[in-house]
């Protein structure tokens, strides 16, 4: 056990022998009846379309690596499972491990060659970076900062649904931070764009890594100021004010979207405040 957590992100050296390995491709992981972690040396002896291998951390003190595969090939007695499945169900420590491994795998896939001169990139031992030996370009794992906000109006909250959502589910508003703006400016702009209302008195609540594929969600509460709801065409299927005692189906418990809603409910009712997962 490492500290109080079973999973600890890190960079175990690929030159060392042994450990566990995850096989990843297109945000899916290979698994069999024993789970997702395979003996590293055994899996590497299989005929795999390997693109890259990276150390990603330790599980119960043992080093863990990710093999990024070119395609999700079929192996006897094994199947591919989507990352999102582990977010919704099962062990949260395991989901954190898989989310990190997926982001590193995607980064390795997308940065095999230099975007400046086309030379094959090389992983560095001293930090998590791909470097071009020809022109020196550095590429770090990508993070895309996004705001997510619950707009409130007393005992009402503004919730919306995208055409991509599970039928019937409503959630908070979210959007990516654009170049040149602060996260707070992004909150005001995205709310205005998505539902046509103005907000103020922003309160930062917390953040959550969201590996679909590489977002960092920064969560807020914001108070309604003015305006009528006008859903953004092609982005928002429906948006409504909901009373706290008559909420629609909501996002998964582990999501920061659900946490923003549950936290506001707790504060209005005087109940104990929930803890943000992760």
Swiss-Prot record:
Binding site for a divalent metal cation 1: 174, 194, 235
Reactions it catalyzes: a 5'-end NAD(+)-phospho-ribonucleoside in mRNA + H2O = a 5'-end phospho-adenosine-phospho-ribonucleoside in mRNA + beta-nicotinamide D-ribonucleotide + 2 H(+); NAD(+) + H2O = beta-nicotinamide D-ribonucleotide + AMP + 2 H(+); NADH + H2O = reduced beta-nicotinamide D-ribonucleotide + AMP + 2 H(+)
Binding site for a divalent metal cation 2: 190
Residues annotated to bind substrate: 84, 127, 140, 208-215, 257
Short sequence motif Nudix box: positions: 175-196
Pfam hit, one: NUDIX
Domain Nudix hydrolase: 141-265
This protein's GO CC annotations: cytosol
Record keyword Acyltransferase present: no
Keyword NAD: yes
Cofactor(s) of this protein: Mg(2+); Mn(2+); Zn(2+)
EC number: 3.6.1.-, 3.6.1.22
InterPro entries: NAD-cap_RNA_hydrolase_NudC (IPR050241), NADH_PPase-like_N (IPR015375), NudC-like_C (IPR049734), NUDIX_hydrolase-like_dom_sf (IPR015797), NUDIX_hydrolase_CS (IPR020084), NUDIX_hydrolase_dom (IPR000086), RNA_Hydrolase_NudC (IPR022925), Znr_NADH_PPase (IPR015376)
PROSITE patterns: NUDIX (PS51462), NUDIX_BOX (PS00893)
Molecular function terms, GO-annotated: magnesium ion binding; manganese ion binding; NAD+ diphosphatase activity; NADH pyrophosphatase activity; RNA NAD-cap (NMN-forming) hydrolase activity; zinc ion binding
Gene3D superfamilies: 3.90.79.20, Nucleoside Triphosphate Pyrophosphohydrolase
Enzymatic class: hydrolase
Domain of life where this protein originates: Bacteria
Binding site for Zn(2+): 114, 117, 132, 135
Functional description taken from the UniProt entry: mRNA decapping enzyme that specifically removes the nicotinamide adenine dinucleotide (NAD) cap from a subset of mRNAs by hydrolyzing the diphosphate linkage to produce nicotinamide mononucleotide (NMN) and 5' monophosphate mRNA. The NAD-cap is present at the 5'-end of some mRNAs and stabilizes RNA against 5'-processing. Has preference for mRNAs with a 5'-end purine. Catalyzes the hydrolysis of a broad range of dinucleotide pyrophosphates.
Similarity field: Belongs to the Nudix hydrolase family. NudC subfamily.
Subunit structure: Homodimer.
Protein name: NAD-capped RNA hydrolase NudC
Organism: Pseudomonas aeruginosa (strain LESB58)
Gene name in the database record: nudC
């Amino acid at each position: 056990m490492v500290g109080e957590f079973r999973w600890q992100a890190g960079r175990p050296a690929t030159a060392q022998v042994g450990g566990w390995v995850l096989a990843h491709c297109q945000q899916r992981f290979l698994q069999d009846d024993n789970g997702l972690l395979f003996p590293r040396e055994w899996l590497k002896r299989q005929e795999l379309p390997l693109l890259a291998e990276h150390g990603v951390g330790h599980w119960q003190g043992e080093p863990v690596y990710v093999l990024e595969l070119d395609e999700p090939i079929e192996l006897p007695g094994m199947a591919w499972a989507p990352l999102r499945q582990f977010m919704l169900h099962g062990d949260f420590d395991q989901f954190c491990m898989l989310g990190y491994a997926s982001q590193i795998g995607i980064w390795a896939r997308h940065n095999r060659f230099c975007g400046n001169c086309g030379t094959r990139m090389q992983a560095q031992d001293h930090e998590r970076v791909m470097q071009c030996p020809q022109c020196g370009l550095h590429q770090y794992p990508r993070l895309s900062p996004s705001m997510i906000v619950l707009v409130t109006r007393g005992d009402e909250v503004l919730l919306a649904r995208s055409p991509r959502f599970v039928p019937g589910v409503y959630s908070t508003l979210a959007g990516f931070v654009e170049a040149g703006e602060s996260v707070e400016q992004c909150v005001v702009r995205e709310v205005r764009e998505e539902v046509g209302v103005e907000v103020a008195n922003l309160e930062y609540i917390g953040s959550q890594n969201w590996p679909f594929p590489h977002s960092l969600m920064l969560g807020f509460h914001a108070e309604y100021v003015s305006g009528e709801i006008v859903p953004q065409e092609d982005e928002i299927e429906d948006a409504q004010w909901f009373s706290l005692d008559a909420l629609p189906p909501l996002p998964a418990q582990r999501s920061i979207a659900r946490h923003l809603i549950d936290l506001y409910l707790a504060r209005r009712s005087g109940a104990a405040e929930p803890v943000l997962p992760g």
